[in-house]
């Protein structure tokens, strides 16, 4: 064979190899490409409380089986989302309960403008105005309302032949009549900031919703303004006059400042107080106990009636969704279901009526709320101003009014001065540094990297062979960033995450892992792949079929787990789930239940804390 022929053969062979390589590459997805595809197909929803994870989230997923939704329990704190925004980790959909446009201002440019959407158009203008920025844009939409007003023992009124209040004057008369028979007419749990804040605003809801009131509120909440905004001199002086009058008429004293929720509930249950300020949920609770209870609104001194409301939470969407039409469409579908009547009915407490700010949700009031039907139909549901400043300053100033330290004029000046004062710098001591960001999207081949980091780190903190955690244990916020104490603490789910440690055999561990993966009676049942548990110290294989999950294998140190192995196991779960998950009493208890957040905080305070590396802990087939 001559050289020319040999070269031709070699060239043809090389071309064949290259061609096969190209074809093979087109037919096989790399692991990285698969993960990118999973990321693109996933819509992440951060929930403000774990309560929503158990009923609300599964319903939303059930209505959108073709959308992969990953629900993560975040924090009820806008500072948490500001931190995620600053470090490239803002989720697709955010929910927050403790909320104000004032505190949300730094997030505005990162959020979608929902003003022209059908979802925003369905909200009554009266309420939508509370969410409009000064430029007319709308970034946040409210779900249904938690109604606060006066919980009233009607049986006591009938027993002492005292007329039920119909206006402010008759409310005061009722308080005076009860005092004559040795019963408090009214009190509330004024040890809490929100009770102080809501009483102050509720008594002046009529004035705060006037044109002047809305003008001030818009200026106070304007995200474009960097100047601190105090109280106006048109609406607010009168608000403190009404608060002072209310304190005088109800005979509130410094002793009331020590009352907490349990104290007030006990007084009401024992017939020691006729009325208290609280949630409408109390009506059903006391009726179930045989106490004839009704709900009443605030009686404004101008004759109007108002209910104080706070949305159970507000929803916002990440503006980055607008860069991908398919992802935006999926997110809007999720938003639509989140705001639906059926979904919102899963938010409210047992026995509460669904009070929606949306015209798409019909008004159906039960016996518990029939006395305020006219108030609701008039759209007199006042949405509180709930900035961090208003919580803190209301607690300070209203408490001093109740204690007799401030007159109305002094209270107004003190409140205004505190709003205008420069903020005290936050404690920015760095307690943890993460050198890289980890994905918090669940991947079929490996699980969630950020959750794995937290599970592996906590396995070291607890000094345990194996750690099992429900998926809602972590907030997924492993970012390339420096963490101060507050943000580091927020890496753990905030709502009562407990730990329990035991020594188990391999056989007992298998059954425990099975309960975490497949669900168990009385416990949490995973409803999508993102809700599957997180494990450390072992790796698991899980089969997915028709929305249910089956444990098919466990390995430890690369080898199948043996039934006669002995291991220490630490389980993390919400308090109400722990008993069901460990109902078999598998193994021997080594440690009592502890709060994970406290253990994590103690670990960070010791200095030198570091995050572990992620591992592939789950294979989903």
Kindly give the residue locations of the regions a language model identified:
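Extracytoplasmic "Venus flytrap"/periplasmic binding protein-like
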Residues: 62-126, 155-166, 267, 274-275, ...
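Conserved N-terminal structural module of periplasmic/extracytoplasmic solute-binding proteins
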Residues: 4, 26-101, 410, 422-425
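Extracytoplasmic/periplasmic solute-binding protein
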Residues: 139, 172-228
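Catalytic centers of hydrolytic enzymes
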Residues: 427-621
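Hinge/lid segment of periplasmic solute-binding proteins
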Residues: 97-148, 163, 172, 198-199, ...
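C-terminal capping/gating helix-and-loop segments adjacent to ligand/active sites or protein-protein/ligand interfaces
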Residues: 51-52, 70-71, 133, 309, ...
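Glycine-centered hinge/linker elements that transmit conformational signals in sensory
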Residues: 218-257
């Amino acid at each position: 064979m001559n050289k020319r022929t040999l070269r031709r053969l070699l060239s043809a062979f090389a071309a064949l190899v290259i061609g096969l390589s190209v074809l093979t590459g087109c037919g096989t997805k790399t692991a990285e490409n698969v993960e990118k595809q999973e990321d693109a197909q996933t819509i992440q929803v951060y929930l403000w409380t774990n309560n929503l994870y158990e009923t609300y989230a599964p319903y939303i997923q059930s209505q959108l089986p073709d959308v992969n939704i990953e629900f993560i329990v975040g924090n009820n704190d806008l500072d948490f989302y500001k931190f995620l925004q600053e470090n490239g980790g803002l989720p697709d959909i955010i929910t927050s309960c403790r909320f104000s446009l004032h505190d949300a201002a730094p997030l505005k440019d990162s959020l979608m403008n929902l003003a022209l959407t059908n979802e925003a158009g369905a909200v009554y203008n009266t309420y939508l105005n509370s969410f409009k920025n000064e430029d007319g844009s709308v970034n946040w939409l409210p779900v249904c309302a938690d109604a606060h007003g006066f919980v009233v023992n009607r049986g006591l009124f009938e027993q002492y032949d005292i007329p039920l209040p119909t206006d402010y004057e008759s409310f005061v008369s009722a308080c005076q009549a009860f005092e004559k028979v040795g019963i408090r007419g009214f009190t509330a749990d004024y040890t809490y900031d929100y009770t102080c804040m809501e009483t102050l605003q509720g008594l002046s809801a009529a004035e705060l919703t006037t044109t002047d009131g809305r003008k001030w509120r818009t200026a106070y909440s304007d995200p474009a303004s960097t100047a601190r905004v105090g109280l106006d001199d048109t609406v607010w002086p009168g608000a403190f006059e009404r608060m002072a009058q209310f304190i005088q008429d109800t005979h509130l004293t410094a002793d009331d400042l020590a009352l907490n929720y349990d104290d007030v509930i006990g007084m009401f249950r024992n017939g020691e107080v006729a009325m208290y300020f609280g949630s409408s949920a109390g009506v059903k609770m006391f009726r179930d106990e045989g106490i004839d209870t009704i709900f009443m609104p605030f009686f404004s001194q101008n004759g109007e009636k108002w209910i104080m409301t706070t949305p159970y939470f507000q929803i916002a969407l990440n503006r980055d969704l607008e860069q991908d039409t398919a992802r935006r469409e999926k997110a809007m579908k999720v938003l639509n279901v989140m705001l639906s009547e059926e979904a919102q009915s899963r938010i409210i407490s047992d026995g509460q009526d669904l009070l929606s700010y949306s015209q798409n949700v019909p008004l159906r009031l039960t016996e518990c709320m029939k006395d305020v039907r006219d108030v609701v139909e008039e759209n007199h549901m006042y949405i509180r101003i709930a900035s961090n400043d208003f919580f803190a300053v209301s607690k300070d100033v209203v408490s001093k009014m109740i204690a007799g330290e401030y007159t109305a004029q002094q209270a107004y000046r003190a409140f205004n001065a505190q709003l205008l004062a420069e903020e005290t710098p936050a404690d920015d001591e760095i307690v943890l540094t993460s050198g890289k960001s980890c994905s918090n999207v669940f991947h079929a081949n490996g699980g969630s990297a950020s959750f794995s980091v937290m599970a592996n780190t906590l396995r070291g903190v607890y000094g345990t062979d194996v750690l099992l955690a429900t998926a809602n244990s972590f907030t997924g916020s492993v970012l390339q960033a420096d963490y101060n104490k507050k943000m580091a603490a927020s890496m753990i789910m905030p709502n009562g995450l407990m730990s329990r440690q035991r020594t188990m055999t391999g056989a007992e561990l298998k059954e425990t892992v099975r309960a975490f993966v497949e669900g168990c009676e009385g416990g949490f049942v995973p409803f999508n792949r993102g809700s599957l548990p997180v494990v450390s110290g072992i790796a698991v294989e899980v089969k997915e079929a028709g929305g249910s999950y089956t444990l098919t294998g466990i390995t430890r140190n690369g080898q199948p787990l043996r039934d006669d192995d002995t291991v220490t196991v630490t389980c993390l779960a919400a308090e109400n789930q722990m008993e069901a998950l460990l109902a078999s009493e598998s193994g021997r208890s080594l440690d009592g239940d502890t709060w994970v957040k406290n253990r994590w905080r103690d670990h960070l305070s010791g200095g030198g804390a570091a995050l572990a590396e992620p591992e592939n802990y789950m294979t989903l087939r």
